[in-house]
Amino acid sequence: MDVIQPRVFNDPIHGSVELPPLLVKIIDTPQFQRLRNIKQLGGNSYVYPGANHTRFEHSIGVAYLAGELVKALRERQPELKITERDVLCVQIAGLCHDLGHGPFSHLYDGMFIPQMQRRRKDQDSSWKHETASVKMFDHMVKENKLDEEMKKDQEFNKELNSPDISDDMLKEKIKKDLEFIKDLINPEISDEEKKAFTGRGEDKSFLYDIVANKRNGIDVDKWDYFARDCHYLGMKNSFDYRRLILSARVCEWKGRNEICFRDKELFNLYDMFYTRFSLHRRAYQHKTGNIIERMITEAFVKANEYIQIKGSRGQTFNLLTAKDDMEAYTKLTDNVFEQILNDDNQNMREAKEILGKILKRNLYKCLGEFPSKRSEDEIKKIKAQVALPGGTKQDDFVVATSKLDYGKKEKDPIEEVRFYRKSDPNKAITLTREEVSYLLPGNFEERLIRIYRKRTNDQTVENDRQYFKKFKSIHNEFSGPQPAE
């Protein structure tokens, strides 16, 4: 194979981005190129004309930011002994963290799969795109012999150029690096279990928080998609990730090395969490975008059994089962929308009609929305109690819930963030609400209920209005206990 040079990408968010040869080799695989055909914001591209960016460019952005942060820590704190292998592993994890997304991104794992599981009374809810990313990463390494490329990569192995390193020892180190990368992609593990990580020791536990931070949500994945999504949605982004990179330090907190930030960056971090809330409120949970995604999901459910995707060993898979075979899953992208739309199979007729309505903007009509603290089960019971207008049935109405928060449900996310002061940069501290401001929100989570009517016209307006009023009235009087504040 020809020697691959570093490649410079002209990114609209980060400018000229140079990635090392090993990452270029990963980018030039079918498994990664698949991300060009998966929209970052799913059905919202039918609401916001500019929101057609994909998981491909987002993943390149995350790889770049992962490198920027870990290199800044290495330069600022040589005592951390961050190696070039560490840097490249973190960058590879950033590049590959979204390999497991299905058609229209979160629509597939957040709406389609749960709906299919309910229809099949399947209680297994363990599948998520992060676990699929790990499986796709394994598949990509195997299909493209990337472990061999890692062995040959001079930059990756510059610290191992020693006659004392045997081929078997090098293989073992690369095996450990691959496990490390997968742990970085999907770090669903408690602090107590961090000792069991095979990739890196406890002294480098902070590396697990760079790409996907399950502890407090501050990670380079969010930094990229906040900036990128705001850009393509045409929204302002007040959060400045560059300031955080400049102030980031690793300090010990309760026996664990964590990435901490200067105390004066607290309001920049609140801007970050508010940006998340605002993007969900204005875009990700947009009332029209949400119903378009529900309509696409309905079409996918109806078309599921008739989609045939060839996978490993000559087997065929459908929309749901393709996720269990990475060869088939590599072929499953947003293009399934057009596949359904252009299929002449009569079994696809209902699915085609739904997708056709989206293109003609004949969408389900939003009758209204209001805040709620009721659970999903309570909302279902309320819907069953609402008297239906004449000539309608329950399926004519869609009751949708949207949850909005700062990233830690009802909790203040800053409670999980560690800071340091200029006077003592090696001591991790927490900041209390009293030290911050009396103007911070008292509640960090809300739930919205939206009611839609599938078929509506001038004659149904009054009935639709009455249905919404009845639903809201029964909701407010429902005998079930409201959750505590």
How should these model regions be labeled?
Residues 1-92, 100-370:
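Sequence-structural signature of the catalytic-core scaffold of metal-dependent phosphohydrolases
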Residues 283, 288, 297, 307-485:
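Terminal helices and disordered tails flanking the catalytic cores of nucleotide-processing hydrolases
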